[in-house]
A protein has these predicted regions:
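Thiol/disulfide oxidoreductase modules built on the thioredoxin-like
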Residues: 121-129, 135-195, 199-201
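Structural microenvironment flanking redox-active thiols in thiol-disulfide oxidoreductases
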Residues: 87-127, 137-145
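Short active-site neighborhood of thiol/selenol oxidoreductases, capturing the structured segment around
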Residues: 64-87, 93
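N-terminal targeting signals for export/organelle localization
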Residues: 1-53, 193-201
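A short beta-strand-turn-helix
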Residues: 45-48, 53-74
């Protein structure tokens, strides 16, 4: 008998979690925060808190805020140039922005480099097609609900639904396969409806 693929297993778990079949912060995986085995925590629609008011100055020196993307599904990724897993996942995040941008998905980075030049070099090396806040002190991280994600390690990623609510988070690196599954479920939710309206096929 053919074994289900990793993508199929993750898709089923994500859909169940986002549809409200699990607890507000139930871990779908319990491995260490590694690029290959991230820890994903989902939030039931009815239990989702407002997303933090991430805002500040981008690496390009321009104002940038999460509030400017209300009505879109936003992937907020915390990274630094010295972080190996951050380098590993950057191409996947870039592809997701280009692939799903016209469907209402936006990727927004939060960079933790002390030196702005290092962050800009990383941005150039990977030709990132999305903006990042420069947050050398990590103050943006403290805006997240306690226990949602491990803010002491990088990378981590949080997902914001169209209503501006926190839908889930990943501690550790995330793959394009994982992003497709999570975002596919969120894109099928109605803005402000508080429920997943379809399951992924």
């Amino acid at each position: 008998m053919k074994r289900p693929s990793r993508a199929a297993i993750l898709t089923a778990a994500v859909v169940a979690a986002l549809a409200g079949c699990t607890g507000p912060e139930e871990p779908l995986r319990t491995h260490q925060s590694l690029p290959e085995q991230p820890l994903f925590r989902s939030m039931r629609p009815a239990d989702r808190p407002d997303a933090p008011a991430f805002s500040g100055t981008s690496l390009a020196g321009k104002p940038l805020s999460l509030a400017g993307h209300r009505g879109e599904v936003v992937v907020v990724n915390a990274w630094a140039s010295w972080c190996g897993p951050c380098r590993a996942e950057a191409p996947a995040l870039n592809r997701i922005q280009r692939k799903l941008g016209d469907r209402g998905v936006r990727v927004m980075g939060i960079n933790n480099d002390t030196e702005l030049g290092d962050a800009r070099a990383f941005e150039g090396d990977y030709d990132l097609g999305y903006p990042s806040l420069h947050d050398p002190s990590g103050k943006q991280f403290f805006k997240l609900p306690k226990g949602l994600v491990n803010t002491q390690g990088l990378p981590f990623t949080v997902f914001v639904d169209r209503a501006g609510k926190l839908a889930g988070a990943v501690s550790g690196g995330v793959s394009e396969e994982d992003l497709d599954a999570i975002l596919g479920a969120l894109l099928k939710e109605k803005a402000g409806a508080g429920q997943a309206v379809e399951a992924l096929g």
